[in-house]
Swiss-Prot record:
Originating gene: hemL
Subunit structure: Homodimer.
Any GO BP: protoporphyrinogen IX biosynthetic process
Name by which UniProt lists this protein: Glutamate-1-semialdehyde 2,1-aminomutase
Organism (species): Aquifex aeolicus (strain VF5)
HAMAP family attached to this UniProt entry: HemL_aminotrans_3
Cytoplasm keyword on record: yes
Recorded catalytic activity of this chain's protein: (S)-4-amino-5-oxopentanoate = 5-aminolevulinate
Compartment(s) of residence: Cytoplasm
Family classification: Belongs to the class-III pyridoxal-phosphate-dependent aminotransferase family. HemL subfamily.
Length: 424
């Protein structure tokens, strides 16, 4: 069946024809493609077109598509049952792996998505501290939970305004929004509201304004201030968890938060989220404590098996140096191609994730990220897609590599990108 026919049918039964807005390709133009198969570093659409995949399910895939060991384990588990509604042994296996691999986590609670993880972490921070305000940073996305789907107004430290209809202003005002990487704004906010701040949630490496690394002093000062004022520091490692190192960004930077939110790679391609932290904090979660959170499908056995097999592979093989070297090769190649064409650009990368911004400015926060030429990005995206290279259909997202992206695949992708850029 053709992509366009599928899209027309989807429009009749799903809002915008999709189950997540970015999939509609509104930011890049053209009709969305429908993917039907993935193997290793490649995916195929409903028309049989093949793409080298740098979307990697928005970073959820790190071993390549359909890794045999993971697929086999899931198939075997599926034969035993799809969901039980009570605790299964695989939850214990995955929880032990998370505690082993993530430095700050002593206990962990599984949920079904990154949004559930951040939502639950915020509730826990408020429950533990008895305070109401949450600090987030402009351009950092933490799922579609009411308290976190807010944008900043003008000024250094602003109370949030709703980022979408359906969020009451009264709820949004409980979130203080600050510029990412701005230590002075952070200090001013704590000076004014510190005794009322329950917690600070941050992507330790921003991935939803494109890849924006933190300034060294930013995370250090963030940790110092939260300790000083008795607020909880929450790292949203839904993207960075298990991608940059087996212990995520917190291991990379040597900074331990109070609560860590996980997702994406944690499920090995199946829907899983989690939040975890120090024992005394997590023991405030029901049924041990009074902070309530629950889920019918939380700890689903298929997702637990998929996640466990994925984390075991990452723990045992630690492919991170190799992934970083491959991303360096890809980034250098893309930079050379764009430079030869005379296209202004900035490439930000950390480990196996990168973003190409079409701006001559150094991108250090959401405001500088927004200087990127989004119209040029849309043309770039469509040109790459036509040549068989799939990147995220948004300027403000990351490209990802998997262990299945061998050197020759990178070379092949760069040739396709070179051909595509010639047409810009």
């Amino acid at each position: 069946m053709k992509n366009e026919k599928l899209y027309r049918e989807a429009l009749q039964v799903m809002p915008g024809g999709v189950n997540s807005p970015v999939r509609a390709f509104k930011a890049v133009g053209g009709k969305p493609i429908f993917l039907v198969k993935g193997r290793g570093p490649r995916v195929w659409d409903a028309e049989g077109n093949e793409y080298i995949d740098f979307l990697a399910s928005w970073g959820a895939i790190i071993l390549g598509h359909a890794p045999k060991k993971v697929v086999k384990a899931v198939q075997e588990e599926a034969e035993k049952g799809l969901s039980f509604g009570l605790t299964n042994p695989h939850e214990v296996t995955l929880a032990k792996l998370v505690v082993e691999m993530v430095p700050s986590v002593e206990k962990v609670r599984f949920v079904n998505s990154g949004t559930e993880a951040t939502m639950s972490a915020v509730r826990l921070a408020r429950g533990v501290t008895g305070r109401k305000y949450i600090v987030k940073f402009e351009g950092c996305y933490h799922g579609h939970y009411d308290s976190l789907l807010v944008s900043a107004g003008s000024g250094v430290a602003t109370f949030g305004i709703p980022g979408t209809p359906g969020i009451p202003e009264e709820i949004a005002k409980l979130t203080i929004v600050l510029p990412y990487n701005d230590v002075q704004a952070l200090e001013e906010a704590f000076k004014e509201y510190g005794s009322e701040i329950a917690g600070v949630i941050v992507e330790p490496i921003a991935g939803n304004m494109g890849v924006v690394p933190p300034k060294k002093e930013f995370l250090i000062r963030l940790r110092e201030l939260t300790k000083e004022y008795g607020s909880l520091l929450m790292f949203d490692e839904v993207i960075t968890g298990f991608r940059l190192s087996k212990g995520g960004a917190q291991e990379l930077f040597g900074i331990e938060p109070d609560i860590t939110c996980l997702g994406k790679i944690l499920g090995g391609g199946l829907p899983v989220g989690a939040y975890g932290g120090r024992r005394e904090i997590m023991e405030r979660v029901a049924p041990e404590g009074e902070v309530y959170q629950a889920g019918t499908l939380a700890g689903n056995p298929l997702a637990m098996v998929s996640g466990s097999e994925t984390l075991k592979d990452l723990r045992d093989k630690e492919p991170y140096k190799e992934l970083e070297e491959k991303m360096e090769k890809l980034a250098r190649g893309v930079k050379d191609i764009l430079t030869e064409k005379g296209i202004q650009h900035t490439i930000n990368k950390v480990g196996s994730m990168m973003t190409v911004f079409f701006t001559d400015k150094k991108v250090v926060d959401f405001q500088t990220a927004k200087t990127s030429d989004t119209e040029l990005f849309a043309k770039f995206f469509r040109a790459l897609l036509n040549k068989g290279v799939l990147i995220p259909p948004s300027q403000f997202e990351a490209w990802f590599l998997t262990t299945a992206h061998e050197e020759e695949v990178i070379d092949e992708a760069l040739e396709r990108i070179r051909d595509a850029v010639k047409e810009l």
